Amino acid sequence: MTKITVFGMGSFGTALANVLAENGHDVLMWGKNQEAVDELNTCHTNKKYLKYAKLDVNIIATSDMTKAIQYADIYLMALPTKAMREVATQINDKLTSKKTFIHVAKGIENGTFKRVSEMIEDSISPEYNAGIGVLSGPSHAEEVVVKQPTTVAASSKDKNVSKLTQDLFMNDYLRVYTNDDLVGVELGGALKNIIAVASGIVAGIGYGDNAKAALMTRGLAEISRLGEKLGADPMTFLGLGGIGDLIVTCTSTHSRNFTLGYKLGQGESMDQALSEMNMVVEGIYTTKSVYHLAKEKNVDMPITNALYRVLFENISVKECVKDLMERDKKSE
């Protein structure tokens, strides 16, 4: 069986580590928190992120970066976007042979506006890079870890990496499709987090199904506009990495982006909401990146613009909704 190192011990990395172990692979997880490492090795749990899940007993964990790097030739990069470049650079400094990188992050880097695969490519020397791919789609960790039927997409510039990802993860409860549009799959996963925060706000305010449906539909329209401008296939946004991920993230309290938005809609400040959640909310960082990227590319993204004002300019959520509804008349 294949050896795989999972970098990151959050909810999704843990759920996917469990999938890999149940598929018969040898899995080592790396994390900085020694208490979490000890808990996983001793109790086979990760209660901070997956409170009630009992994990495969064959999963092992370490906080030793060198051990994690040497363990396998395939790395699952299950880290927040803002941590990806730093950890990838640390990995690169210790590499002595080629590795394959599969990431599950859903964000756009602040400042550079780069997708996660581009961040990894920047950080890993070509002589050590055997290929980079992404696994993305509608997939709450809480459901994956209890074997609820889930379907996702694997994508890479290298079809062999996409096929490898499919082979590693697919089983009777996790179905994996390959997709050749790496740009589209990564953008779909990242951009839907913006709409998910906005969707949570709408729910928190107490608006009805009409508003929620309009938000997701018009959100998908602006995702597609930016995606096409950046070289994605518009059809990708009608698939698992696009509308599939959008629906699941915009309608569920499992989604930390939706949950943040809901708390904001209920009148909480962002600092208060984040302190209660104690988790990384990718949508905040993605909103900041995409707001500036859309302006640079001259792409109209009114929902993103409105959310940016709420998150970073202290504009009230109801004022932003009013502004969206009173925009100039347009054709769909």
Swiss-Prot record:
Disulfide bonds: none
Catalytic activity reported: sn-glycerol 3-phosphate + NAD(+) = dihydroxyacetone phosphate + NADH + H(+); sn-glycerol 3-phosphate + NADP(+) = dihydroxyacetone phosphate + NADPH + H(+)
First-listed, main subcellular location of the protein, grouped into a coarse class: cytoplasm
Name under which the protein is recorded: Glycerol-3-phosphate dehydrogenase [NAD(P)+]
Binding site for NADPH: 11-12, 32, 106, 141, 256, 280, 282
Gene Ontology molecular function: glycerol-3-phosphate dehydrogenase [NAD(P)+] activity; NAD binding
Keywords: Cytoplasm, Lipid biosynthesis, Lipid metabolism, NAD, NADP, Nucleotide-binding, Oxidoreductase, Phospholipid biosynthesis, Phospholipid metabolism
Catalytic class of the enzyme: oxidoreductase
Function, as annotated: Catalyzes the reduction of the glycolytic intermediate dihydroxyacetone phosphate (DHAP) to sn-glycerol 3-phosphate (G3P), the key precursor for phospholipid synthesis.
Active site feature: 192 (proton acceptor)
Pathway stated in the Swiss-Prot or TrEMBL entry: Membrane lipid metabolism; glycerophospholipid metabolism
Any one of the GO BP annotations: carbohydrate metabolic process
Family note: Belongs to the NAD-dependent glycerol-3-phosphate dehydrogenase family.
Enzyme Commission number(s): 1.1.1.94
Annotated compartments: Cytoplasm
Gene3D superfamilies associated with the record: N-(1-d-carboxylethyl)-l-norvaline Dehydrogenase, domain 2, NAD(P)-binding Rossmann-like Domain
A GO cellular component entry from the record: cytosol
Any single Pfam family the record assigns to this protein: NAD_Gly3P_dh_N
Binding site residues for sn-glycerol 3-phosphate: 106, 137, 139, 192, 245, 255-257
HAMAP family membership: NAD_Glyc3P_dehydrog
